[in-house]
Curated annotation (Swiss-Prot):
A GO molecular function held by the record: methyl-CpG binding
Role according to the record: Plays an important role in the ligand-dependent activation of estrogen receptor target genes. May play a role in the silencing of fetal globin genes. Recruits the 5FMC complex to ZNF148, leading to desumoylation of ZNF148 and subsequent transactivation of ZNF148 target genes. Plays an important role in the tumorigenicity of glioblastoma cells. Binds to 5-hydroxymethylcytosine (5hmC) and associates with the methylosome complex containing PRMT1, PRMT5, MEP50 and ERH.
Lineage, opening ranks: Eukaryota, Metazoa, Chordata, Craniata, Vertebrata
Signal peptide annotation: none
Tissues expressed in: Expressed in an erythroid progenitor cell line derived from peripheral blood. Expressed in glioblastoma cells.
Full protein name: Chromatin target of PRMT1 protein
Subunit structure: Interacts with PRMT1 and PRMT5. Interacts with the 5FMC complex; the interaction is methylation-dependent. Interacts with FYTTD1, SET and PRC1 complex members CBX4, RNF2 and PHC2; the interactions are methylation-independent. Interacts with ZNF148. Component of the transcription/export (TREX) complex at least composed of ALYREF/THOC4, DDX39B, SARNP/CIP29, CHTOP and the THO subcomplex; TREX seems to have dynamic structure involving ATP-dependent remodeling; in the complex interacts (methylated) with ALYREF/THOC4 and with DDX39B in a methylation-independent manner.
Keyword presence, Phosphoprotein: yes
Disordered: annotated segments: 151-204
Biased composition (Gly residues): 157-195
Subcellular location: Nucleus; Nucleus, Nucleolus; Nucleus, Nucleoplasm; Nucleus speckle
Amino acid sequence: MAAQSAPKVVLKSTTKMSLNERFTNMLKNKQPTPVNIRASMQQQQQLASARNRRLAQQMENRPSVQAALKLKQSLKQRLGKSNIQARLGRPIGALARGAIGGRGLPIIQRGLPRGGLRGGRATRTLLRGGMSLRGQNLLRGGRAVAPRMGLRRGGVRGRGGPGRGGLGRGAMGRGGIGGRGRGMIGRGRGGFGGRGRGRGRGRGALARPVLTKEQLDNQLDAYMSKTKGHLDAELDAYMAQTDPETND
């Protein structure tokens, strides 16, 4: 039954040429010579360059383009001042002695009330939270006020304070956060004054050597590289050392 169900297939249009011969003949007929390829590419480039030249000529003849070419200025004339400091203003890491907050001027930063710190005779430097002067207490988040201190128009009134020159973001001055009368303000954590450096009215007002801008910047970088826990530990140690009565 299998032999009966498989009829014989007869192909009428057959050829004795092999596939290799057939494709070889097709390749010979279609392949152009390299000389023809180079000639065609040069012809296309010449046509494109002619079009570009015509387009450039048309653009030059336009009145708007001619007016723009007449007003052509040099790069310095168009840019104006090339001094970066003149355009950006005072650099952030400026020397702080009178640079950001002068003698007796408050610094207001990061959402502090407009009243700032009023009262007292020394420069008040305040960052996000507040400070008590003469190293008595730290107002964390503005929720606590040091004892023996009165409020005056939304600020703190103290007996001493940090020394000359306020501290802003990236600047240093004489009397900020730190140990015994020198240091910096870091990362908006609040600050306190150096011990007795309020214009020579406190305890132990000492003469300090004047530091250069590079030394102040190096101290600031070293301070800002410390972690929050390290700063809190230093602050607690300083508070316990300067005014042990607040721990009672």
